Amino acid sequence: MEEVEIEVSAPGDGHPDAVALPLTEDESTPRSDGDLAAQLQQLADDGELKGELGKTTLLHTDGETNARRVVVAGLGKRADVDADAVRTAASAVARRLGDVGGTLGWTLDESLPLSADEQARAVVEGAVLGSYSPARWKTQQKSGKRIAKIVFYGASNGVEQTAARATHVAKWVNWARDLANSPPNELTPEILAARAAELAGERLEVSALDPAQIDELGMGALSAVGRASANGPRLIVLRYEPAEAKGDVVLGLVGKAITFDAGGISLKPALKMYDMKGDMAGGAAVIAGTAAVAELQLPVHILTVVAAAENLVSGESFRPGDILRAANGKTIEITNTDAEGRLVLADAMWYARREGATHLLDVATLTGAMEVALGDLYAGLFANDDAWRDDILAAAQESGDHTWPFPLHRRYRRYVDSAYADLKNSSELRQGSPVLAAEFLREFAGDGPWAHIDMAGPGFLERSRGDYYTQRGGTGYGVRLIVELAQRLAA
């Protein structure tokens, strides 16, 4: 995976292929001097310069500056400028320069309501994520050049470290996007385990349990979901145990990785079933997030557990009416085989607790109702511990992987009661289904802080949401949040 080189320099130094000048809607022209300022003013007078968010204007300088090109990048209204706006502007610039690539200069603006560090981080993330293409399976690839280097003007040397960290993390976000976009014939549970195993090294240990080992441990929920497929389930385990880790916290990350979800006997409609390859986006996020933390050598223990399976239909399928026994001993009546994500997470969370996780966070594309509630920008967050919830919310806000808190209350628990078993996997009650799913998961979270992120909306997009750093398909949601959370735990 290629990374972007970072440099801090004085304005006018070097010869970048292009320089970006941010512009808000409150200004007519960006800050500049000399002949370029006059040219920009003329364009503004002609109505060609726009500070609207995501708008770009490209100028060829003809030697009037040290750069061959200048791109004016719209940030929107000054009062609304935040990290998301800077990411959007930077990704729009990266796409505009898709045929040029090379070195991009970016002028940091101290008058914006963001620190230089915050601006630089957002610029790098926007440029790297905005350069991503999901079309690697096309036989006719578009010719283009990537941005290989970003030079920041008007910054201190501390910005360089922040920006370098951001390019590491963004690289892993794109890696997770590649996994989520992979066709299901190229990404079975076994292949996903092999992809994870490629990440093993001196600082990261990776292993996987096969179907026989899953059965031996009594993981009846995960086993049942995966048994209809010729591609059996896997439980993928990553361990990052740096000697310099601080405190006794072991961050347990649990990911749902249904590499293709047909719904089982409770079959999904044919319409858009092809997007169910993305039902492993949570698993991709926790694998990539763990790899990013290991690469950054953050001093925190992480145990990552990914439950991978295909939810298909065959003579071996589990059925509505079946009663399964999960690894923690609880029995589950199956009322809907398309509520399989919570089943595989149940056994994976048990395993994470058994292996020593003190703080659990599960990440999953779990309920369509969450997408209805929050759309494609925010994920829903549930937690059994207020302090743990607040830690995750803070990491989400800082990282740009947005979450919104939802309630957990024991009075919801009765809706997943079963007349025949300890609980049922799906309620006939349509209202509040994300909350009921979280209440189901709570039964398997064990003792200690636990949180659940339902990323059904932002994890895999049906269409572009217009911010340029995401597009149709996998977004890599959760990777940046995980790294930020690990950073906070390591502090």
Predicted region positions:
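Short amphipathic alpha-helical segment within the helicase RecA-like ATPase core
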Residues: 1-257
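A generic structural signal for tightly packed, nonpolar segments enriched in small/aliphatic residues
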Residues: 50, 192-491
